[in-house]
């Protein structure tokens, strides 16, 4: 897959079902949020991932034990100048 350019928006389908199989019921929603963060960081090649409150609420909608099996999200990547150089930041919102 090609690298996402800064300012570009891409839609991803995050397969949360993978998490549901290996995590105890009472940890599923928090682990799903972490999985979304890791998935987007890996695919968008971003150092930081900022998840919107809408995405968080969608994951927690049915409680801690039953997050959705998959989630369609819109990702926008920006580059920012910091002390250590350029940093890629991915902003995640519902698609």
From Swiss-Prot:
InterPro entries: Ribosomal_eL31, Ribosomal_eL31_CS, Ribosomal_eL31_dom_sf. Gene3D superfamilies: 3.10.440.10. SUPFAM superfamilies: Ribosomal protein L31e. The keyword Ribosomal protein applies. One of its GO terms (molecular function) is structural constituent of ribosome. GO terms for cellular component: cytosolic large ribosomal subunit. GO terms for biological process: cytoplasmic translation. It comes from the Archaea. Keywords: Ribonucleoprotein, Ribosomal protein. Transmembrane segments: none annotated. The keyword Plastid does not apply. Belongs to the eukaryotic ribosomal protein eL31 family. This is Large ribosomal subunit protein eL31. It comes from Pyrococcus horikoshii (strain ATCC 700860 / DSM 12428 / JCM 9974 / NBRC 100139 / OT-3). The lineage of its organism: Archaea, Methanobacteriati, Methanobacteriota, Thermococci, Thermococcales.
């Amino acid at each position: 897959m090609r690298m996402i350019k800064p300012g570009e928006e891409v839609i991803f389908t995050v397969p949360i079902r993978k998490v549901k199989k290996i995590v105890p019921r009472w940890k599923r929603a928090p682990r799903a949020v972490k999985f979304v963060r890791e998935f987007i960081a890996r695919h968008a090649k971003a150092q930081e991932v900022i998840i919107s409150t809408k995405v968080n609420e969608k994951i927690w909608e049915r409680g801690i034990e039953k997050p959705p099996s998959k989630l369609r999200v819109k990702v926008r990547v920006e580059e920012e100048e910091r002390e250590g150089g350029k940093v890629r930041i991915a902003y995640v919102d519902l698609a």
